[in-house]
Amino acid sequence: MNAHKERLESNLLELLQEALAGLNDSELNSLSVTKVECSKGKHHALVFVLSSDHKILSKLKKAEGLIRQFVLQASGWFKCPKLSFVSDNSLEKQLRLDAIFNEIAKGRDND
């Protein structure tokens, strides 16, 4: 990954967290953005949030225009990528892997 793309994603992550914190919806302004992946050319960004609730993801989709407007004003960019919000389940996967490794370790201890 090149440095420009990393910087862009990092800046966008910070701006998105600020934008969410400024919303009037208590469910949205307490969300955590964990990761942002931008496509080439900054046309599209995949935004990972710590929520698996479809209702919250739907609210984010409805608020996309306000969020993009905030990003444009705060960043000074000419255009903002189209945002797609998805649930970040990497923490759940990591917890499952840890549980599996613990079971394996217990099995070895019993031998």
Swiss-Prot record:
UniProt record similarity statement: Belongs to the RbfA family.
Gene3D superfamilies membership: 3.30.300.20
Principal location listed in the UniProt entry: cytoplasm
UniProt-listed SUPFAM superfamilies: Ribosome-binding factor A, RbfA (SSF89919)
Compartments reported by the entry: Cytoplasm
Subunit details: Monomer. Binds 30S ribosomal subunits, but not 50S ribosomal subunits or 70S ribosomes.
One GO-annotated biological process of the protein: maturation of SSU-rRNA
Function, as annotated: One of several proteins that assist in the late maturation steps of the functional core of the 30S ribosomal subunit. Associates with free 30S ribosomal subunits (but not with 30S subunits that are part of 70S ribosomes or polysomes). Required for efficient processing of 16S rRNA. May interact with the 5'-terminal helix region of 16S rRNA.
Alphabetical list of InterPro entries matching this protein: KH_dom-like_a/b, RbfA, RbfA_dom_sf, Ribosome-bd_factorA_CS
Keywords: Cytoplasm, Ribosome biogenesis
Pfam families in the cross-refs: RBFA
Keyword Cytoplasm in record: yes
GO cellular component, one term: cytoplasm
Keyword rRNA-binding recorded: no
Protein name: Ribosome-binding factor A
